[in-house]
C-alpha cells in the first residue's frame, strides 16, 4: 500500500516566510537607495563650471596694548575692490581643488583640498589599530587558551560590554580625562590630537576585534591542540605556533571589521582629535578626519552649494571604503577559513 505524505499547509509559516523575505529585500533596497542618494548629491561637484574667485581681504597692522607693529590680522574691505589688495584669484573648477593641501571651505576663495582629511584619517586609524589590535588578539588568546572557565566567563562579557557604550561617552571620556592625562605624560602642546583620538577609537574597536578573534581561535579543531600537547609542546607554544596560525584568516577578518569601525567613527573623532585640517606627520598634532568633517559642517552648509556637494563626496568615499572592508572580511577571509578547515578534514 502506497502512502503519500503531504506536507500540511500552514498559513502562519507561509506568512512568516514572506515577511522575512520582504524584510531582507527591503534592507537591500534601502542600502542601494542610500548609495544612490549619496552619489547623486556628490556628483554635481564634477560638473560645475570654472569660476573666478577674488579675495578682497587686505593685511593691516593692529597693535595689542601698545604701539607694537609685529602682529597683523586680515581685515575685510567693505563695498570696494582695490586691485592692490587682491591676495589671490583663481579660475578653476571646484573639483580641481580636491587634490590641494588646503581645506578652507568658508572663504572668498574656497579650497576643498582633501589631503589633510585623508592624512588625519590615516593617522588616527593607524594609531587606533596599533593600540586595539594587539590588545584584542592577546586578550582573545588568553581567554581561549589559558584562562580558567570562571575567569573566561567574567572577562569576555566585560570586554563585550564595552561595545554597548555610546560613542559620545567614549569621546567625552577622551576629552575630559585621557587628553589631560596624556598631555601631562608626554608634554605636547595640542591637548586634543591624533594620539588621543586614536586611543579613544581603539577602545571602541576592541570589543569587535576581540570577539571575532576569540571566535576564530575557538573554532580551531581541538585535535590540533591535543596533537600539539601530545607531542610535548607547552600550552604557550601550542597557542602561538599552532592555534594562532590556524586562526589567521579569522583574525584578519576581525581586524578588517575593526578597521571599518574606526574609519567610520564620527563622534569620538569630533570630540577628541582637535579638528584642525592640516598636514603634519606628528601624531601629537591636531587633525581632522573625513567623518568628523561631515559631522561638524553638514548642518551649516547651504543646500546644493559646492561645500554641500563636497561633503557628500566625502560621504561617498566613506561608504565605498567601509563597504569594501566589510565585503572583504565577509567573503574573502571567511572563505579562507572554510577552505582551510575543510582541507584539514
PLM-predicted stretches and their roles:
Residues 269-319:
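Interhelical loop and adjacent transmembrane-helix boundary motif
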Residues 4-14, 18, 43-128, 148, ...:
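Periplasmic/extracellular loop-to-transmembrane helix junction in inner-membrane transport proteins
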Residues 160-205:
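Generic hydrophobic transmembrane alpha-helix motif, especially the helices
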Residues 10-38, 42:
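N-terminal signal-anchor/first transmembrane alpha helix
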Residues 17, 139-174, 343-345:
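Cytoplasmic-entry segments and transmembrane alpha-helices of multi-pass inner-membrane transporters
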Residues 212, 221, 229, 235-271:
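Transmembrane alpha-helices
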Amino acid at each position: 500500500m502506497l502512502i503519500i505524505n503531504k506536507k500540511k499547509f500552514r498559513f502562519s509559516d507561509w506568512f512568516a516566510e514572506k515577511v522575512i523575505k520582504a524584510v531582507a529585500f527591503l534592507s537591500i533596497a534601502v542600502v542601494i537607495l542610500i548609495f544612490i542618494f549619496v552619489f547623486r548629491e556628490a556628483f554635481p561637484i564634477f560638473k560645475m563650471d570654472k569660476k573666478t574667485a577674488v579675495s578682497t581681504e587686505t593685511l593691516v597692522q593692529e597693535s595689542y596694548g601698545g604701539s607694537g607693529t609685529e602682529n597683523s590680522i586680515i581685515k575685510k574691505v567693505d563695498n570696494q575692490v582695490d586691485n592692490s589688495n587682491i591676495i589671490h584669484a583663481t579660475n578653476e573648477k571646484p573639483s580641481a581643488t580636491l587634490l590641494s593641501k588646503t581645506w578652507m571651505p568658508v572663504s572668498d576663495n574656497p579650497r576643498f583640498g582633501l589631503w589633510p582629511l585623508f592624512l588625519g584619517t590615516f593617522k588616527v586609524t593607524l594609531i587606533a589599530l596599533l593600540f586595539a589590535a594587539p590588545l584584542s588578539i592577546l586578550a582573545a588568546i588568553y581567554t581561549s587558551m589559558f584562562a580558567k572557565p570562571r575567569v573566561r566567563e567574567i572577562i569576555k562579557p566585560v570586554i563585550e560590554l564595552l561595545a554597548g557604550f555610546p560613542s559620545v561617552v567614549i569621546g567625552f571620556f577622551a576629552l575630559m580625562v585621557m587628553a589631560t592625562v596624556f598631555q601631562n605624560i608626554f608634554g605636547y602642546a595640542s591637548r586634543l590630537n591624533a594620539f588621543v583620538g586614536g586611543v579613544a577609537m581603539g577602545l571602541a574597536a576592541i570589543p569587535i576585534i576581540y570577539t571575532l578573534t576569540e571566535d576564530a581561535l575557538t573554532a580551531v579543531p581541538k585535535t590540533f591542540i591535543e596533537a600539539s600537547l601530545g607531542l610535548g609542546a607547552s600550552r604557550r607554544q601550542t597557542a602561538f605556533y599552532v592555534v594562532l596560525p590556524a586562526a589567521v584568516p579569522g583574525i584578519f577578518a576581525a581586524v578588517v571589521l575593526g578597521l571599518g569601525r574606526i574609519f567610520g567613527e564620527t563622534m569620538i573623532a569630533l570630540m577628541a582629535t582637535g579638528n584642525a585640517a592640516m598636514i603634519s606627520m606628528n601624531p601629537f598634532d591636531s587633525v581632522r578626519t573625513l567623518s568628523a568633517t561631515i559631522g561638524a559642517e553638514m548642518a551649516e552648509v547651504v543646500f546644493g552649494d559646492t561645500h554641500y556637494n563636497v561633503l557628500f563626496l566625502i560621504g561617498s568615499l566613506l561608504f565605498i571604503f567601509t563597504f569594501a572592508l566589510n565585503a572583504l572580511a565577509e567573503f574573502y577571509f571567511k572563505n579562507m577559513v572554510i577552505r582551510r578547515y575543510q582541507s584539514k578534514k
